[in-house]
Amino acid sequence: ERTHTGEKPFECSQCHKRFTRDHHLKTHMRLHTGEKPYHCTHCDRHFVQVANLRRHLRVHTGERPYACELCASR
C-alpha cells in the first residue's frame, strides 16, 4: 500500500533519507555504522547486504547466470 501512496514513515536519523519499510532503514543504517555482517568464505571481502555477497561469490564460482539476448554469450 505504501508503494502506491508514496508514504515513507521510516527516516534515517543521520541523513534523513526516508523509507517505506523498517527493514530497509535498518539495512541503510549499516552504511553509517560501517557494519558489514556478510562475509565471503573465499576471500576477505565483507558486505552490507547479502545480495551483494551473492553477486560477489560468482567471482569465485565462475557462475554467469545471464545470457546476452543477441548472441547468447554469457
From Swiss-Prot:
Gene Ontology CC terms, in alphabetical order: nucleus
GO MF term set: DNA binding; DNA-binding transcription factor activity, RNA polymerase II-specific; zinc ion binding
Going by the UniProt record, its keywords in alphabetical order are: Developmental protein, DNA-binding, Gap protein, Metal-binding, Nucleus, Repeat, Zinc, Zinc-finger
Q: Where in the cell is it found?
A: Nucleus
Zinc: is it a keyword of this entry? yes
GO BP annotations, alphabetical order: segmentation
- Positions of the zinc fingers (C2H2-type)? 1-4, 10-32, 38-60, 66-74
Q: Please indicate if the UniProt record lists Nucleus as a keyword.
A: yes
Entry's Gene3D superfamilies? Classic Zinc Finger
- Record InterPro entries: Znf_C2H2_sf, Znf_C2H2_type
Q: What does this protein do?
A: Krueppel is a gap class segmentation protein.
Q: Which family does it belong to?
A: Belongs to the krueppel C2H2-type zinc-finger protein family.
Official protein name in the record? Protein krueppel
Q: Which gene encodes it?
A: Kr
